Amino acid sequence: MADLVDHSPHHATKAAKLASASNVILIDNYDSFTWNIYQYLVLEGATVTVYRNDEVTVEDLVAKKPTQLVISPGPGHPDTDAGISNAVIKHFSGKVPIFGVCMGQQCMITSFGGKVDVTGEILHGKTSELKHDSKGVYQGLPTSLEVTRYHSLAGTHSTIPDCLEVTSRVELGDASGKNIIMGVRHKEFAVEGVQFHPESILTQYGRKMFRNFLELTAGTWDNKQGAAVAAPADKKLSILDKIYAHRKNAVDEQKKIPALRPEALQAAYDLNIAPPQLSFPDRLRQSDYPLSLMAEIKRASPSKGIISANVCAPAQAREYAKAGASVISVLTEPEWFKGTIDDLRAVRQSLEGLPNRPAVLRKEFVFEEYQILEARLAGADTVLLIVKMLDIELLTRLYHYSRSLGMEPLVEVNTPEEMKIAVDLGSEVIGVNNRDLTSFEVDLGTTSRLMDQVPESTIVCALSGISGPQDVEAYKKEGVKAILVGEALMRAPDTSAFVAQLLGGSNQNFAGASPSSPLVKICGTRTEEGALAAIQAGADLIGIIMVQGRSRLVPDDVALGISRVVKSTPRPADTLQQPSSATSLEWFDHSTNILRHPSRALLVGVFMNQPLSYVVSQQQKLGLDVVQLHGSEPLEWSSLIPVPVIRKFAPGDIGIARRAYHTLPLLDSGAGGSGELLEESGVKKVLDSDEGLRVILAGGLNPDNVAGTVKKLGQSGQKVVGLDVSSGVETNGAQDLEKIRAFVKSAKSIRQ
């Protein structure tokens, strides 16, 4: 850093009175720098009146007819400590020019829907190098200059609303390449702010910045003032053009990162590590509703600004799947829609293990193969291709490349000419965007008008602008097969209820089908007689111990005899209403059904910290229907064992709710057979940690306490889908047949 230079106007020449700044009002947020701002404004010829933020009303200011407004710095947070500043910005935006300094800028960001947060450092008089866009208050200034900062808060990049643009930045200074927002400007209104202090003696060209502001006379930029010098070029570009140009630059930069080079992505794909995919058209044809739902995860949009900035994409995806969505659309454009490819990757992971998961669509402005390959590696089943932004040659190339990766694209059209292109291309799925991407106007009749151009075999999806059942009725009659809904779903307080209302049906179709009574597992079985008694009593699972050194270890010859009894003895079957094949049933609801054989009990072999090869060989030798891992075996073993796997967890263990590995988790206190009851609060905490979790409960259960133990868990007890007993049905170390019968009866009576 160079020596500090005093840029203050020690012997400043006062400018002549500015007729355009004859009634400037300065809102004082109780900050000492307000005097310095007043000084600079007056030196530039303004006539200024100062009001503290709690001593004047908006109505008072309206009556005073200000020519310009300035919002001063101040201590605290813009949401709680700025008095009427936010109300002033909201009322006068578009009417008169407004300039905000430090907290004044933060008020502008929050007033238009953004957020401010801590920057990670508290600055008091620090000088930094500023980079700016040479428009607005920066007109006529060098592109790099020294400014002074007094702040700990600043606007956050991810929440800057679409109506504002970032005009200046300083580097974070940690070699990360990240920067802190130092200036914002409204794209339409003459509203501009700076995070630094132009009135500080260490800021270069501070007076010039105030002069540039004072020369503004209108409330908008459309009269060729200030920032509008460069605005006409932007005005000629549609939002689609802007996004395309921005994404092109961003993707070009991304491909320079060594790990993200096209060659690196191709090498990863060649290793066959992309998540398994499904057929997008086939999944669209499966729905319990009259139309298939493409449910969109949408944090923001150019037309609506911030919709739900803090949404957890994978959690939202599970909600959509539970509500019956056939497709989940994930917006991965970061600037206007606030999404990333990481959202898609997390969404795909969250759907792992669903028996009939929704397809995953990458909703992005795709213009090269790199983006399609990136999508497939992240887990996409399909990508969006927008006819309006691609020439026919490029569209054709991208379409066939996507199909070469097993992904039938969603081809988006808006006009009859674009529909003809999509049909000639051979598109199996065509989306009609009811929103014109050049004007962003919505016309829900667009889809209907284009239907007569489409072959009967083509799936047509209506995109954009759908908010309620009234928007859907006509589509049902006209042959539309699917609708895409984003904003309305994101704002719905109850996703499943909204979907049922929107598409006409009952969200009860999508509730997990649960047995009327829990599974019962009689463990530690050592005789054919014990197995037979348990089965005849109605037990679902017969457990035999395969752990060397344990008192309940069953020799192979005895185990084979028990196996024959289990497989030849019928038992009364519970009736379970199977869900529709189109339903995305939760993993643990599905796997509970797997452990409920329609006509007999299942034989479970219990192992603990034994080699995988031994576990597999014993499973094959003894004909085990299920394997139980009761030690610290890797989670991945569940996918390497050729039968369903029950895995033991203690409260607090990591991985209990991981889908697509263990069939069900068994919640137990120790090594098994200890007779120790689990602490009620610990069990509740585990069960309440994940809405979709289901468990087999073990540890200290017996015929007398099993019903009460589950009842004490309250509503959480509904997630207990199985009960495991060993020592609780023994007398003097041997299985007691009467206790077995009593336990099964008591356990089965819990939910009838």
From Swiss-Prot:
Coiled coil: none annotated. Its EC number is 4.1.3.27, 4.1.1.48, 5.3.1.24. NCBIfam families: PRK00278.2-4, trpG_papA. Trifunctional enzyme bearing the Gln amidotransferase (GATase) domain of anthranilate synthase, indole-glycerolphosphate synthase, and phosphoribosylanthranilate isomerase activities. It catalyses: N-(5-phospho-beta-D-ribosyl)anthranilate = 1-(2-carboxyphenylamino)-1-deoxy-D-ribulose 5-phosphate; 1-(2-carboxyphenylamino)-1-deoxy-D-ribulose 5-phosphate + H(+) = (1S,2R)-1-C-(indol-3-yl)glycerol 3-phosphate + CO2 + H2O; chorismate + L-glutamine = anthranilate + pyruvate + L-glutamate + H(+). Residues 519-752 are annotated as: N-(5'-phosphoribosyl)anthranilate isomerase. The keyword DNA repair does not apply. The keyword Nucleus does not apply. Keywords: Amino-acid biosynthesis, Aromatic amino acid biosynthesis, Decarboxylase, Glutamine amidotransferase, Isomerase, Lyase, Multifunctional enzyme, Tryptophan biosynthesis. This is Multifunctional tryptophan biosynthesis protein. Pfam families: GATase (PF00117), IGPS (PF00218), PRAI (PF00697). Pathway: Amino-acid biosynthesis; L-tryptophan biosynthesis; L-tryptophan from chorismate: step 1/5; Amino-acid biosynthesis; L-tryptophan biosynthesis; L-tryptophan from chorismate: step 3/5; Amino-acid biosynthesis; L-tryptophan biosynthesis; L-tryptophan from chorismate: step 4/5. GO terms for molecular function: anthranilate synthase activity; indole-3-glycerol-phosphate synthase activity; phosphoribosylanthranilate isomerase activity. Residues 239-503 are annotated as: Indole-3-glycerol phosphate synthase. The active site is at residues 102, 197, 199. L-glutamine binds at residues 74-76, 106, 152-153. GO terms for biological process: L-tryptophan biosynthetic process. It comes from Penicillium chrysogenum (Penicillium notatum). Residues 23-223 form the Glutamine amidotransferase type-1 domain. One of its GO terms (cellular component) is cytosol.
